[in-house]
Amino acid sequence: MKVLVIGSGGREHAIVEALARSEYHPKIYAVMGNANPGIRRRAEDYLLEKETNVPAIVQYAQDCNVDMAIIGPESPLAAGLADELELNGIPVVGPRKDAARIEFDKAWTREFMARNNIKGLPKFKVYDDYDDACRYLEDNPDVVVKPAGLTGGKGVKVMGEHMHTLEEAREYVKSVLEHDRVVIEERLKGEEVTIMAFVDGKHVAPMPTVQDHKRAYEDDQGPNTGGMGSYTDNIDLLPFMTLDDYNEGVAIMEQTVKAMEKDVGVPYKGVLYGQFMITRDGMKVVEFNARFGDPEAMNVLSLLKTDFVDICEAIVDGSLDKLKIEFERSATVCKYVVPAGYPDNPVKDAPLTVVEKPEYLVYYASVNERDGKVYTTSSRSLAIVGVADTIADAEILSEEGLSNVQGEFHCRHDIGKERLIRKRIEHMDAIRG
């Protein structure tokens, strides 16, 4: 069996490692924007190409005679890569463009949720006119402002965190409207969590809950990033969650998948990522993504017991309900190594020396490899994942991995530490009253 993986980040390295563990021993082919050393090591062959160059990728898939493709990032989904591969007879794990719109058009997603009475919808407005948006802001200052389109996780601004005055909010709205529609939503109070699920068009198979850390600096300070790291507990829940929270999130995702085929006429196949805020009034949808999260993929795929090839085939042929999907009952802590100065002024081409050991997992991301060393680019470099019986023990292993990375870099040491988790628990206790 031959499987093509599109993407060159930590998420795609985790996908490739999950394939490499399969008892089917698939031959792995890759299309990457940069030559990810972890993927390169596992691949029979690879193409260095923009992940949105649809004709080149389809041609490569045909030349390699692949049996299946797995699309990692959002941009090729938005470019319609899944549609073109399927048209050429190649089954895809990843939704077609009309279904992937749930990620790349936030305005459409909110309107889709409203049309289909999907639960967990915050109050929202969509504007393409600056004056109308400003009038709404004056009456509703406690908001979140986001562009309708893709922003790599960095375009969302929250009043009281990224913006502190109405003037700042107006300025941000103005800058968004220069190239996009703007979505203004009520600011939700609670804890953000990620629930991802395998989806075959009808059936939803959820994974353990993950919490990502978007802010660049310790104690949740600094600018937003693509995600500095994440953790899971040794059950499907996180320490501040209830089973009702989890079940409510999964039910919202099931409702969304059901509505997708009815509303859009295209079944949703691939991974659905639900980002939820646990509030006093239950689970609210912060956003949906049409693929694995990065870093969250590295947590859940490191725990996956069921053969990943079986899961991919079940997604493609609509038989997920016949497959029992199991995860190790362990905790994980993932910490990203990023270039010094990331995200605003990342130091490029800085050398990193990485010692890999069996005590922890290393997933490579946006680095280049020369002469046995890896070199930073402008994006996240590599992630270290600790897997253990408890979050505390997994965190110790991730720190051991970080101590074996030499060079100039930044990371968040506080992810998975007791103090930060305790803060989340106390925050949620206060919210629930």
From Swiss-Prot:
Q: What are the binding positions for Mg(2+) 2 in this chain?
A: 287, 289
The record's keywords, sorted A to Z, are:
ATP-binding, Ligase, Magnesium, Manganese, Metal-binding, Nucleotide-binding, Purine biosynthesis
| SMART domains membership | GARS_A (SM01209), GARS_C (SM01210)
Q: In which pathway does it act?
A: Purine metabolism; IMP biosynthesis via de novo pathway; N(1)-(5-phospho-D-ribosyl)glycinamide from 5-phospho-alpha-D-ribose 1-diphosphate: step 2/2
The record's comment on cofactor binding reads: Binds 2 magnesium or manganese ions per subunit.
UniProt keyword Ligase present: yes
Report the cofactors.
Answer: Mg(2+); Mn(2+)
Q: What is its EC number?
A: 6.3.4.13
Instruction: Tell me what reaction this enzyme catalyses.
Output: 5-phospho-beta-D-ribosylamine + glycine + ATP = N(1)-(5-phospho-beta-D-ribosyl)glycinamide + ADP + phosphate + H(+)
The enzyme's first-digit EC class, named in words, is ligase
GO-annotated biological processes? 'de novo' IMP biosynthetic process; purine nucleobase biosynthetic process
In this chain, Mg(2+) 1 is annotated as bound at 275, 287
Whether Manganese counts among this entry's keywords is yes
| List of residues binding ATP | 138-194
Q: Where does Mn(2+) 1 bind?
A: 275, 287
State what protein this is by name.
Answer: Phosphoribosylamine--glycine ligase
Per the UniProt entry, what species is this protein from, by scientific name? Methanocella arvoryzae (strain DSM 22066 / NBRC 105507 / MRE50)
Quote the gene name from the UniProt entry: purD
